[in-house]
């Protein structure tokens, strides 16, 4: 099991051809460092694909996700901007649901 204590989403798109080293360099450029037990999420320009980089304290994990239909609800592109997500928001995001409306405990936080 990979321990994840915090989840960060980058608003600027990333080329999905990026491998582990390129994705790690992008995390460092956007977030300043790859902190242990943190997940960093990136999407392509069309928000149809997503990559997640996790530093588990010993090494780096890189996972990719693509939806069969639709696209991810990604925030607008803002230079150097990042957003912290909770577990419920991440679960909604990876399913292609509007994660901005999901709050902890299933509460609705935005109409």
Regions found by a protein language model. Name each.
Residues 1-111:
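Polybasic/polar functional segments that serve as interface/processing modules
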